[in-house]
């Protein structure tokens, strides 16, 4: 616990650390550099495409080969480990998905994504209220992943603590069939069939994959089937259409729940309290179709339209707790969205040129929520005996408009010393819930409406061809999701009940960042940034209990951090990656969670100012050394190998920062070996890997603010485990 004086001293020390770090970065990048052109990779910097080297933001790109080399291509956490500022924790619990946070946004999530926008092939994969599921991304057909952090992410609207965009690979000129199979520890099986080809102006990529695992822990088996198809057609020389179909079917994912510290120590492979008895599990099915139409009026003016829609069903069985019976929740969601944008370039301005974009997003989801009690893991469906207690219809919709301008200032000598970026997004988000079960009274009734203007401003100083310095600032907001508003803390202590949480409000945040991008020589690239984020009414976990989680608004939070990324190509055969992130995420002022006693609202627990936000390690490091016999080109043959190191510092699972919720830091080493060969036109690729080479025992993820009566915070990481696979590529 920190007193006011301690907190001031602590912040003063953080500011000193920031100055020292910045001085080191500027000293490093001011060293003599060899003449070298900047990074030519084009990324989405805010809403406008821009060279990665020139963008006034932290933008990282993971190419297709890196995605495939990272693991079995099942979880986004495999590839995202290398991105500074992104904490991707594998729960090894496929019922709840991986836990991903960007600069601390998303760490509160009990399942799926929160605080992060997910976009696949130009189609939003995040609902209007801010929910997303990373498991629906098809990694077996992914060509590229981009991660945008910092102020410019606010141009994507609600819950844009960061933006993750993925793209399916383009079809080649020659039809090709790819067959792959992967096996691993604990009964892991993944099989994939992919067809790609092009006929005239029409190209298609169709990918179907299956995944099964018996699970490391008891009650942790899972099964998935997934199809991802992208059809592109050049309708006219200046008009292109992309159709996207994504089908995701997870008929069964058992939920082992978390473990207490004593359970973790006794046997990390066991399931949590009553998980086996109540057969805790989840089934999910999602079908989505989308279309993106791009028309170019001229080389300097283009228009884009996007339309999508889909359905999602989610059936979950939850365990009995001390206060609540075992239960089930059935969610049936329909969603639809429309967006448009006009993008242009003005080249004949007096002082340079300008890129600009204007656009809008309209999205809506409708979710029918039913719930009731279970017996031995099966529904008790008798309404007259109050065994079915939820029948609600919840809707989320957003109406957004946005704009962005990049002004490339050119001086009298024809040089471009500065690029100034400005943007604004106006958002209106509405959440409504109505109740159709008279027995539950007004428990399912409520609404939350939020409006916000999110301005951003940034500048890049092109000091040399090898060095760019940038600074940016922005404001953002985040609404509660429908799932977060669906539960409240009960009148009694340590209990979560199915009641719409009318007390939740949207959080408001202010982001600032400075950074440097340096390419000292061919094959060397260094990115460094410092940032500060202040948030009011941050949405945090009040209480979590066996799959049911209630949330509350904290008064103020503060995030201060530094990120460093260094990519090096040492020779044709050797390269390395290194990233480091330091994040101090704290409650900047004291706040209380509430309960009701005798009809009066009283304090439940008091969180002191200075306590660290749970689920966020203060330090994270990643290093990878890679070797390739015949170089790193995507089609290079021969042997290749890599050794990766991931290190994370300690973190807390409770905002009380008590000893029982502290998780020790850890280091793990992963190895990969691969061989590619070719006979005629047929290519064969075989690979093998070992994760956690040293067999380190560690906690892979935490469930934030579990009930004090059953503090099942911990989800164990895997011990040493192996995987091996083979892929056959046959031109047709």
Language-model segment annotations:
Residues 176, 183-212, 217-255, 280-299, ...:
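Transmembrane beta-barrel wall of Gram-negative outer-membrane proteins
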Residues 294-296, 302-318, 462, 468-474, ...:
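Membrane-embedded beta-barrel scaffold of Gram-negative outer-membrane proteins
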Residues 353, 357-464:
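Signature of Gram-negative outer-membrane beta-barrel scaffolds
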Residues 76-79, 99-103, 116-120, 133-135, ...:
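N-terminal periplasmic accessory domains that precede
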Residues 107, 116, 123-149:
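Short acidic/polar hinge/loop motifs at secondary-structure boundaries
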Residues 21, 122, 234, 246, ...:
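Conserved C-terminal beta-signal and adjacent last beta-strands/turns
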Residues 343-348, 409, 420, 525-534, ...:
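Gram-negative outer-membrane beta-barrel transporters
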Residues 251-264, 364-373, 379-380, 428-437, ...:
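Surface-exposed extracellular loop regions of Gram-negative outer-membrane beta-barrel proteins
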């Amino acid at each position: 616990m920190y007193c006011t004086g301690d907190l001031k001293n602590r912040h003063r020390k953080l500011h000193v650390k920031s100055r020292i770090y910045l001085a080191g970065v500027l000293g490093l990048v001011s060293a003599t550099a060899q003449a070298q052109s900047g990074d030519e990779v084009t990324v989405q910097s805010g809403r406008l495409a821009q060279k990665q080297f020139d963008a006034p933001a932290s933008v990282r790109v993971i190419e297709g080969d890196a995605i495939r080399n990272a693991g079995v291509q099942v979880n986004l956490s495999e590839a995202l480990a290398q991105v500074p500022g992104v904490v991707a924790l594998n729960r090894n619990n496929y019922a709840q998905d991986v836990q991903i946070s960007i600069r601390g946004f998303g760490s509160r999530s009990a399942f799926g994504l929160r605080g992060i926008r997910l976009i696949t092939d130009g189609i939003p994969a995040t609902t209007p209220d801010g929910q997303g599921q990373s498991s629906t991304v098809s990694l077996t057909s992914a060509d590229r992943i981009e991660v945008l952090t910092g102020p410019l992410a606010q141009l994507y609207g609600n819950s844009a603590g960061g933006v993750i965009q993925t793209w399916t690979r383009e079809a080649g000129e020659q039809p090709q069939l790819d067959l792959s199979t992967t096996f691993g520890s604990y009964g892991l099986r993944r099989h994939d069939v992919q067809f790609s080809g092009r006929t005239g102006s029409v190209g298609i990529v169709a990918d179907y994959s299956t995944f099964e695992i018996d699970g490391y822990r008891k009650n942790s088996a899972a099964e998935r089937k997934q199809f991802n198809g992208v059809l592109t057609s050049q309708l006219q020389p200046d008009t292109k259409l992309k159709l996207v179909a994504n089908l995701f079917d997870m008929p069964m994912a058992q939920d082992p729940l978390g473990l207490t510290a004593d359970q973790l120590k006794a046997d990390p492979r066991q399931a949590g309290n009553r998980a086996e008895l109540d057969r805790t599990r989840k089934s999910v099915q999602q079908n989505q179709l989308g279309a993106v139409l791009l028309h170019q009026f001229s080389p300097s003016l283009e228009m884009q339209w996007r339309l999508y829609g889909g359905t999602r069903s989610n059936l979950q069985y939850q365990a009995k707790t001390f206060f609540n019976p075992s239960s089930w929740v059935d969610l049936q969601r329909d969603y639809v969205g429309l967006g448009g944008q006009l993008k242009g370039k003005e080249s004949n301005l007096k002082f340079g040129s300008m890129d600009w974009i204007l656009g809008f997003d309209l999205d809506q989801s409708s979710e029918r929520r039913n719930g009731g009690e279970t017996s031995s893991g099966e529904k008790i469906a008798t309404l007259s005996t109050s065994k079915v207690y939820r029948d609600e219809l919840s809707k989320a919709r957003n109406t957004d408009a946005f704009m962005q301008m990049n002004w490339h200032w050119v001086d009298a000598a024809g040089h471009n010393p500065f690029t100034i970026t400005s943007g604004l997004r106006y958002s209106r988000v509405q959440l409504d819930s109505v109740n159709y079960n008279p027995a539950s009274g007004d428990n399912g009734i409520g609404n939350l409406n939020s409006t916000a203007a999110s301005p951003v401003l940034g500048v890049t100083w092109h000091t040399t061809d090898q060095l760019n310095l940038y600074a940016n600032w922005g404001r953002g907001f985040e609404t509660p999701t429908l799932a977060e508003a669906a539960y409240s803390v009960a009148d009694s202590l340590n209990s979560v009940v199915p009641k719409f949480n009318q007390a939740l409000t949207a959080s408001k945040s202010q982001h600032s960042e400075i950074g440097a991008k340096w390419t000292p020589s061919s094959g060397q690239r260094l990115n460094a940034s410092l940032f500060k984020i202040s948030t009011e009414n941050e949405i945090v976990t009040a209480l979590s209990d066996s799959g049911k989680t209630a949330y509350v608004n904290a008064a103020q939070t503060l995030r201060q951090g530094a990120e460093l990324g260094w990519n090096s190509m040492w020779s044709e055969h050797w390269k390395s990656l290194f990233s480091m992130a330091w994040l101090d995420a704290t409650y900047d002022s004291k706040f209380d969670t509430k309960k009701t006693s005798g009809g009066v609202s009283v304090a439940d627990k008091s969180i002191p100012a200075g306590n660290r936000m749970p689920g966020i390690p203060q330090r994270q490091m990643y290093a990878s050394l890679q070797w390739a016999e015949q170089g790193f080109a995507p089609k290079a043959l021969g042997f290749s190998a890599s050794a990766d190191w991931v290190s994370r510092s300690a973190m807390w699972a409770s905002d009380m920062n008590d000893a029982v919720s502290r998780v020790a830091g850890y280091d793990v080493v992963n190895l990969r070996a691969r061989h590619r060969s070719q006979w005629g036109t047929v290519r064969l690729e075989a690979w093998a890997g070992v994760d956690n080479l040293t067999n380190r025992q560690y906690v892979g993820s935490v469930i934030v603010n579990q009930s004090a009566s059953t503090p099942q915070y911990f989800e164990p990481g895997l011990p040493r485990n192996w995987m091996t696979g083979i892929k056959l590529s046959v031109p047709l």
